[in-house]
Amino acid sequence: MKKQDISVKTVVAIGIGAAVFVILGRFVVIPTGFPNTNIETSYAFLALISAIFGPFAGLMTGLVGHAIKDFTTYGSAWWSWVICSGIIGCLYGWIGLKLNLSSGRFSRKSMVYFNIGQIIANIICWALIAPTLDILIYNEPANKVYTQGVISAVLNIISVGIIGTILLKAYASSQIKKGSLRKE
């Protein structure tokens, strides 16, 4: 089996993606009134980076970005949610493999596929995995963390569904469509 190297382009994407994730996570959030639960724009951006550069870039961007955001905001990381940011980035990247955004096409069928995938991924990560890890790692009360998880899942579904879809459409539209250039 041939060893696959990580390209410089992917490493740069992870670094820039993590930095933008931190900025969005710190400064472009809308509070919900429920403790530690916000409408996050950073996950829509994570969906874009993941769809363009793949599951590994999504995983690393989510992990590094969320960890730095937590350290700079709270002084320490809430590892159960950091892990889930990595998982969701990987899942967005996996969904993005089928989208083929570089072809310049992001059809309604692709939008539906992306949104069904992100809905399932957000429910798995935020409503199931994150609260379960909170209980196992931090001994948090189940009713509190599952409520936070469900609220976060719904808010991320909405944020990624609207902002993420717009970002993916804008990116695909900026690409040259295959066969659109003709030799004269």
From Swiss-Prot:
Q: How does it sit in the membrane?
A: Multi-pass membrane protein
Q: Where in the cell is it found?
A: Cell membrane
Which keywords belong to this entry? Cell membrane, Membrane, Transmembrane, Transmembrane helix
Q: Which GO terms describe its cellular component?
A: plasma membrane
Main location, first listed in the record? membrane
Q: Which Pfam families match?
A: ECF-ribofla_trS
Q: Which InterPro entries match?
A: ECF_substrate-spec-like, UPF0397
Q: Where are the membrane-spanning stretches?
A: 11-31, 44-64, 77-97, 116-136, 148-168
HAMAP family, from UniProt? UPF0397 (MF_01572)
Q: Which NCBIfam families match?
A: PRK13661.1
Similarity-based family? Belongs to the UPF0397 family.
Q: What is this protein called?
A: UPF0397 protein SAOUHSC_03020
